Each structure stands twice: as structure tokens, then as C-alpha cells.
Curated annotation (Swiss-Prot):
PANTHER family assigned: NUCLEOID-ASSOCIATED PROTEIN YBAB
Subunit structure, as described in the record: Homodimer.
Keywords: Cytoplasm, DNA-binding
Places the protein is found: Cytoplasm, Nucleoid
Record protein name field: Nucleoid-associated protein A1S_1684
Major subcellular site: cytoplasm
Family the entry assigns: Belongs to the YbaB/EbfC family.
Keyword field contains GTP-binding: no
Superkingdom, natural source: Bacteria
Role according to the record: Binds to DNA and alters its conformation. May be involved in regulation of gene expression, nucleoid organization and DNA protection.
Lineage start: Bacteria, Pseudomonadati, Pseudomonadota, Gammaproteobacteria, Moraxellales
Coiled-coil segments on the chain, per record: none
Length: 109
């Protein structure tokens, strides 16, 4: 195999990877994760791109202390972020499959 063929193959692989990453990012923007805290008193919906779409607070909770509400919102958002990270890593790993990238590196692109 000569150098020109290797360069062409590398360019094709790069274009494929860029296309796969773009597609994965588009899918992540459409993917939603749902998290909750306090046994469902606070619910958060977030995209795979970490955009909070909705926060639901059970009306019963509004009668409690503001500190408790704030803590539950933070817990639900943090749970949603963890879920979004997992979904993101899976989609990016899939987008980069065949590229020989080690696990964890795919999410950097």
C-alpha cells in the first residue's frame, strides 16, 4: 500500500468520524433523560446535550422549607446530568466505533 492510498484512507476515516459525531450530537439533542429526587417530589427532564427542558415540583413540596426544595432540585438535576453523561458516552462511543479510540476518549469529540 503506498502513501497516497494511506492518506486517502485516513481522509475517508476522518470524514466518516466527523459525520458520525455530528449525527450522534444531533441524536443527543433529541434524546431526553428523566430524573427525580425526594421520591418523585421533584422531576427533571434534560436532553443528552445537558439542556434542562423541564422541572416539575409536586405542589405538596411547596409547603416545605425552601432549603429542602433547593436541595431536591439540585439532586434531581445532578441525577439527570449523570444519566445524560452515560447516554452521551454511549452514543459517542458508537459514533467512533471502528476508529480504534479507547473508551472515554470518544466523548471528547
Amino acid at each position: 500500500m503506498n502513501i497516497n492510498m494511506l492518506m486517502q484512507q485516513a481522509q475517508r476515516m476522518q470524514k466518516d468520524m466527523e459525520s458520525n459525531i455530528k449525527k450522534a450530537k444531533e441524536e443527543l439533542a433529541q434524546t431526553e433523560v428523566h430524573a427525580e429526587a425526594g421520591g418523585g417530589l421533584v422531576k427533571v427532564t434534560m436532553t443528552g446535550r445537558y439542556i434542562v427542558k423541564r422541572i416539575e415540583i409536586n405542589p405538596e413540596l411547596l409547603q416545605d422549607e425552601p432549603d429542602m426544595i433547593e436541595d431536591l432540585i439540585a439532586a434531581a438535576v445532578n441525577d439527570a446530568v449523570r444519566q445524560a453523561e452515560v447516554v452521551s458516552e454511549e452514543k459517542m462511543q458508537k459514533a467512533n466505533s471502528g476508529m480504534g479510540l479507547p473508551p472515554g476518549l470518544a466523548g471528547m469529540f
